[in-house]
Amino acid sequence: MERTYLMIKPDGVQRNLIGEIVSRFEKKGFTLIGAKLMTVTKEQAETHYAEHKERPFFGELVDFITSGPVFAMVWEGENVIATARKMMGATNPADAEPGTIRGDFGVQVAMNVIHGSDSPESAKREIDIFFDSSELNEYDKVVNRWV
């Protein structure tokens, strides 16, 4: 079963959006197998955003993601990566469709509420940055027969 890493960023946590966002993924039929409220360390942030290291906004990304708690999650389900990307909406909330998380709640590119893995490789890498394997729970849900 495919897994993805999703993170509600500090702006989403501060705006009390955790429940709303988790509910959307649960209603879609995905299974939450790991979750925690945490403060991202500078080392984790730099590893997570390593692909942007040479970009002028790298420091701002690291500062923002370490500025307050995030809600880190691992979700499992059929096509969860692509579906989560659609549910999140465009990176720039101004371009995100209404009904998507960023379209409904995003304020600006820097504060766009949520991060989600963009590929199976990214998902594995990001899950390994933020979770120990002992923090992930595999279980069967009766509802899985219906979704």
Swiss-Prot record:
Any single GO CC term annotated in Swiss-Prot or TrEMBL for this entry: cytoplasm
Catalysed reaction equations from the record: a 2'-deoxyribonucleoside 5'-diphosphate + ATP = a 2'-deoxyribonucleoside 5'-triphosphate + ADP; a ribonucleoside 5'-diphosphate + ATP = a ribonucleoside 5'-triphosphate + ADP
EC code: 2.7.4.6
Primary site of residence: cytoplasm
Single GO MF descriptor: metal ion binding
Enzyme class: transferase
Ligand binding (ATP): K9, F57, R85, T91, R102, N112
Keywords: ATP-binding, Cytoplasm, Kinase, Magnesium, Metal-binding, Nucleotide metabolism, Nucleotide-binding, Phosphoprotein, Transferase
Pfam families linked: NDK (PF00334)
Keyword Magnesium: yes
Gene Ontology annotations of biological process type: CTP biosynthetic process; GTP biosynthetic process; UTP biosynthetic process
Enzyme active site: H115
Compartment(s): Cytoplasm
Residues modified as Phosphoserine: S122
InterPro entries from the UniProt entry: NDK-like_dom, NDK-like_dom_sf, Nucleoside_diP_kinase, Nucleoside_diP_kinase_AS
Necessary cofactors: Mg(2+)
Residues annotated with Phosphothreonine modification: T91
HAMAP family (alphabetical): NDP_kinase
Job of this protein: Major role in the synthesis of nucleoside triphosphates other than ATP. The ATP gamma phosphate is transferred to the NDP beta phosphate via a ping-pong mechanism, using a phosphorylated active-site intermediate.
Oligomeric and partner information: Homotetramer.
Family as reported in the entry's similarity comment: Belongs to the NDK family.
NCBIfam families, alphabetized: PRK00668.1 (NF001908)
The name this protein goes by in its record: Nucleoside diphosphate kinase
Organism the protein comes from: Halalkalibacterium halodurans (strain ATCC BAA-125 / DSM 18197 / FERM 7344 / JCM 9153 / C-125) (Bacillus halodurans)
